[in-house]
Amino acid sequence: MLDLKRIRNNSNEIKEALNNRGEKFDVTVIDEVLKLDEERRNILVKVEVLKSKRNQVSSEVPKLKKEGKDVSNIVAEMKNLSEEIKGFDATLAKIDEKIQYIMLRIPNIPNPQVPDGETDEDNIEIRNWLEPTKFDFEPKAHWDIGTNLNILDFERAGKVTGSRFTFYKGLGARLERAVISYFLDTHTEKHGYTEILPPYMVNRTSMIGTGQLPKFEEDAFKISEDDYFLIPTAEVPVTNLYRDEILKGDELPLKHVAYSACFRSEAGSAGRDTRGLVRQHQFNKVELVKFTKPEQSYEELEKLTNDAETVLKELGIPYRVVRICKGDLGFTAALKYDLEVWMPSYNRYVEISSCSNFEDFQARRANIRYKEDAKAKPQYVHTLNGSGVAIGRTVAAILENYQSEDGSVTIPEVLRPYMGGREVIK
């Protein structure tokens, strides 16, 4: 959520920034929120005048009573003033509700570093690692490799549940578990993150806090009876861990890593990478989340991105890092990098992680603040997160980049200790 004071003082700048985003945003709502804000402030002035008058009148009552004078007129005036204040308070509550409704639907403002552009084709490659994998045979797609090795079963998952679900079997299940354990061990032991195992269901307030709601409710799996949501990413519960709290400045940055299953309806994604493991309704992911002081956040974003890159380097999977343009930035991020792995069957790079700085956008929605010391005024933290990284897509990238002509798959060296020393799946 944006700072209303920032909108008030820089409305034209805000409108221009919002106009440059991918989804054309109706900037007239900025004028609407400013009009409501002005109305609210005018009413507050009136309320303060009325309260001052009521206090002045009420202070006269004891003295007049002591003198034996009739105070019925003054009491009646006090009652009228209180009723008038009550009416204004009700109006203010309605105005606040309208302002909140609009503010929750205004996207974040892109950082000046974000490049211009309208689609993902305008994203800028920052760096890459390893050349795309070459084969002297026609490489197979990971869904064919997994099916032929009897380690992935899409057909039976379709029977049991529906499309875009998977059974991992035998060494496929073990490979998935190995990747999860390797990622968690790397981020906790080498990168200094504290591990969190979060709930897989959250309430509506949590989804609003991280920006999934109200805009993306159609993409969420909802348990209507309790108004709970299955998490689309561990970012939601881990960020909301500190909702409505004031952190200590010397604790920052806080660094958490969380493994979780993730659940997404992927509404509107029909036909986009829907085969295999790339776009599933349920998938596993290791998430990195940071809470920082504002002046630290962009340095910490670079570190977070490098932490995510480390596991791809150690796995030996070719990848690149792209800086996301304004048109492809999404609702909540101020600046975002995507890590994309090379997928031979696609003959292109596929996103495996998004690393974002939200600045104070989520912190304002979730009311997460910090104080430098006991006497200092609370300030909003900056929140960051990134996949560290998506598990299913990692398994897919391993199957495709490490495949052999005979259909077997070499296990990356760093995963072999988690696979009982096994070197090949065949």
Curated annotation (Swiss-Prot):
It is found in: Cytoplasm. Its main location: cytoplasm. SUPFAM superfamilies: Class II aaRS and biotin synthetases, tRNA-binding arm. The keyword Glycoprotein does not apply. It catalyses: tRNA(Ser) + L-serine + ATP = L-seryl-tRNA(Ser) + AMP + diphosphate + H(+); tRNA(Sec) + L-serine + ATP = L-seryl-tRNA(Sec) + AMP + diphosphate + H(+). Gene3D superfamilies: Bira Bifunctional Protein, Domain 2, Serine-tRNA synthetase, tRNA binding domain. Pfam families: Seryl_tRNA_N, tRNA-synt_2b. One of its GO terms (cellular component) is cytoplasm. L-serine binds at residues 233-235, 287, 387. It is an enzyme of class 6 (ligase). Its EC number is 6.1.1.11. ATP binds at residues 264-266, 351-354. The keyword Lyase does not apply. One of its GO terms (molecular function) is transferase activity. GO terms for biological process: selenocysteine biosynthetic process; seryl-tRNA aminoacylation. CDD domains: SerRS_core. Keywords: Aminoacyl-tRNA synthetase, ATP-binding, Cytoplasm, Ligase, Nucleotide-binding, Protein biosynthesis. InterPro entries: aa-tRNA-synt_IIb (IPR002314), aa-tRNA-synth_II (IPR006195), aa-tRNA-synth_II/BPL/LPL (IPR045864), Ser-tRNA-ligase_type_1 (IPR002317), Ser-tRNA-synth_1_N (IPR015866), SerRS_1_N_sf (IPR042103), SerRS_core (IPR033729), tRNA-bd_arm (IPR010978). HAMAP family: Ser_tRNA_synth_type1. Consists of two distinct domains, a catalytic core and a N-terminal extension that is involved in tRNA binding. Catalyzes the attachment of serine to tRNA(Ser). Is also able to aminoacylate tRNA(Sec) with serine, to form the misacylated tRNA L-seryl-tRNA(Sec), which will be further converted into selenocysteinyl-tRNA(Sec). Homodimer. The tRNA molecule binds across the dimer. Belongs to the class-II aminoacyl-tRNA synthetase family. Type-1 seryl-tRNA synthetase subfamily. This is Serine--tRNA ligase. It comes from Clostridium botulinum (strain Okra / Type B1).
